[in-house]
Regions:
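Cytoplasmic helix-loop-helix junction between adjacent transmembrane helices
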Residues: 100-137
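Helix-loop-helix hairpin linking two adjacent transmembrane segments in secondary transporters
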Residues: 126, 131-186
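Symmetry-related core transmembrane helices of the 12-TM Major Facilitator Superfamily/SLC fold
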Residues: 161-179, 370-392
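Residue-level signature of mid-helix packing/kink "hotspots" within the transmembrane helices
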Residues: 23, 51-59, 144, 246-254, ...
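Helix-loop junctions at membrane interfaces in 12-TM secondary transporters
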Residues: 90-100, 284-294
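Extracytoplasmic
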Residues: 6-38, 116, 223-228, 339-343
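Extracytoplasmic gate region of multi-pass secondary transporters
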Residues: 25-26, 202-250, 339-344
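Conserved MFS/SLC helix-loop-helix module at the cytosolic interface between two early adjacent transmembrane helices
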Residues: 56-95
Length: 402
């Protein structure tokens, strides 16, 4: 018998592990740089291993989901998380940190590959949308918790090794919750066929969603990744902004099921694109207290992107199966990694342009940062058009089916 509640709680703790690995590792970067005499470029490469391992294992996990099952994928996630944590703690230097971060990234990708389709197989309709949103609530929620833990432990002068051990706690918890459990079977037999999956994945609607996912992911992660650098001179505290965004995202996702049930995924995605565009526009034009208002609009916009893109695939393109969900998620992570370098180039060119106008110091930093954010408005701007098309596309499809 399948204990769906225990499996769901195990999935949540696995995603908290992912979030902790993101936020705690970010919090200890200065300590790692000091301990191992690492420069900024080396720290950047270490961080990139997290993003490299994630989509690789997510896509491979989706490909073999129905062959080996979610149980074995999560067992592999536990092994790679554990090895990554231990290797980080006992790392002798740069190479060891590269390998350990890659292993943790692989474990994180396995979590997405196994848990999304598992939740979709165990539930349907409103319940599925509710639980997918509440599952994904724990990524921003875990980032808030992890950031607070890292901040507290750093202020208590506890070493970075002790902070990494915290990630092991949630790893052991999810392993215990999954231990000995019966995992759900696919609701449709055809879903287990890779051939049927691929056939569904070359449909116009799937390819459309795949393109949208590239833009939703960078709309969400782009501004957040550069918050500290871009907004440091705006008169608002970057870490408070990040905490406000992730906290609101967690709350929004908790109540996401009811909102999706009322407005459908297409309506929610369209509204999310509008709010995200407004949020980034305010970031690019406002300073002081209004930056926090911008953060509220931005958080309410991006919080429903990821879970509802996955939920749309699960509900509207079910024959794409676990592979379809994993490819969509992988596209999100891949586009994020690609666009990071582009955004960095925008910052450099904006800084040069504003410097040529005679600006210096914090005035230069603010002008360059806000100019870069105006470029980022294009991501949700394009999505408004695409999701409006999707909204009427699906509404007409429902009318035709009726």
């Amino acid at each position: 018998m399948t204990n769906s509640n225990r499996l769901f709680y195990g999935s949540c703790f696995a995603l908290i592990t992912t979030a902790f690995s993101f936020s705690i590792r970010a919090g200890i970067l200065p300590q790692l740089a000091e301990s191992f005499d690492l420069n900024g470029q080396q720290l950047g490469f270490i961080n990139s291993m997290w993003f490299l391992g994630f989509p690789i294992s997510m896509i491979l996990g989706g490909l073999f989901y129905h062959t080996i099952g979610p149980k074995r994928i999560m067992q592999f996630a536990f092994i790679t998380h554990t090895l990554g944590i231990i290797l980080t703690i006992f790392s002798g230097g740069y190479t060891g940190l590269l390998i350990s971060t890659l292993l943790i990234g692989i474990g994180n990708g396995c979590t997405e590959a196994a848990c999304n389709p598992m939740i979709a197989d165990a539930h349907e309709g409103k319940q599925m949308n509710t639980l997918l949103n509440r599952f994904h609530m724990w990524f921003p929620g875990g980032i808030v918790l992890g950031s607070l833990v890292s901040l507290l432990m750093t202020s208590l002068d506890l070493g970075w090794q002790a902070q990494i051990w915290i990630i092991m706690i949630t790893t052991v918890i999810y392993a215990y919750l999954f231990m000995g459990q019966t995992f759900p079977k696919p609701r449709t037999d055809a879903v287990t066929s890779v051939g049927e999956n691929l056939k569904a994945m070359i449909s116009p609607i799937y390819l459309f969603i795949l393109g949208c996912m590239a833009l939703t992911a960078i709309s969400e992660f782009g501004p957040q990744q550069w918050t500290s650098l871009i907004l440091s001179s705006s008169g608002a505290h970057p870490m408070v902004i990040l905490a406000l965004i992730t906290g609101l995202m967690a709350i929004g996702r908790y109540f996401g099921g009811d909102i999706v049930h009322k407005y459908d995924q297409t309506g929610v995605l369209l509204g999310s694109a509008v709010l995200t565009a407004v949020g980034i526009f305010l970031f690019s034009t406002q300073t002081g207290g209004m930056v926090y208002v911008a953060a509220i609009f931005f958080a309410l916009g991006v919080c429903y992107f990821w879970p509802n893109m996955i939920g749309f695939v699960a509900e509207k393109i079910p024959l794409s199966g676990a592979l379809g969900m994993s490819i969509v998620g992988g596209m999100g992570m891949f586009s994020t990694s690609i666009f990071q370098a582009i955004i960095g180039g925008w910052i450099d060119s904006s800084t040069a342009e504003q410097s040529a106008k005679g600006l210096t110091g914090t005035t230069l930093e603010l002008a360059a940062g806000q100019q870069t954010l105006t470029y980022m408005i294009s991501f949700p701007g394009i999505l408004i058009i695409l999701f409006a098309i999707l909204y009427f596309w699906q509404r007409n499809a429902k009318a035709a089916a009726a």
